[in-house]
Amino acid sequence: MRSSQQFLRRRYAFTLVELLVVIAIIGILVGLLLPAVQSAREAARRMSCQNNLKQIGLAIHNYHDTYRQFPWVNANSTLGGGSAFVAILPHMEQSNSFRLYDFTKSNRDPYNRQVVSQRLPFYWCPSAVERRPVPECDSDAGRAPGSYAVNIGTEDYNQYWSFFGQPQPSLDGMIVYSDARDRKTKFASVTDGSSNTLLVGETAYNLPDYLFSFGACRGESRFSFTYWCNPFPGSTACTTEYAFNPKDVAGDGIFDRGWVRSFRSDHIGGVQFVFGDGSVHFVSENINAETLDKLAARNDGEVLGEWGL
């Protein structure tokens, strides 16, 4: 009887082999589920980014309804004025911030710091990765990063073109980056059709532009200077002249400074755009370069049908 009771009270534990098997099974399940979870999270982030672009596109439409033209991107100085994203602040329910901004001063001016330092969620893609904090050692200090850039067309814009005797770029994007106020564009200027023309796309804080040569950041990389307040090309104005969605691979020796003026994203496989009609599309990084140029130009006469993504 005693032995029977002892038998009933006996407790069995996992053997080491059984425990290892259970751990292995759990590891396999985690390995199978983790990519699906990550994919679902990225899909949610991408959808949020799409909503940002839709909101920006609608704000530009409202700006056009008010002023009968698209926002003008100031090219007289890399320091002066403000970006198109500053101009549309009232249409992004940010009228108070807009009223605080002084367009007669630089976007780097301490007076405008109270506005340009704001990290506005609709100007920042949830998938974006900030490689390091915005530096506090030069005139970049205090300006919040952004994730979006207007389409200035198929050619880069050098604000010093006349000084160097270079031909003026074609300025064929939906938004004109120009030092001439009469070059502002309207929907009537988009003769290829607003549904066939890029309006705003993504940019990313992911390319080392150059090394700081002075100050507290000496020797550190400055990444892409994508500040939503800055009207300079590469910050809030991009072109299709350079590689589309370029990636800087450490150690491969391949880098083009022009890449900082290319549309790019931290999404996998492509870049999102809001077109002139307000529709948002994900454009594959494998798109034909000629096709991308046709989408960037507002008036080249090349109207695309089913161009594909």
Model-derived regions, located:
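N-terminal leader/signal peptides at the extreme start of proteins
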Residues: M1-L16, D65
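Coiled-coil-like amphipathic alpha-helices with heptad-repeat character
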Residues: S4-Q6, A36, R41, S213, ...
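Intrinsically disordered, low-complexity segments enriched in polar/charged residues with Gly/Pro
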Residues: Q6-F7, L19, R257-S262
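N-terminal single-pass transmembrane signal-anchor helix
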Residues: R11-R45, Q55
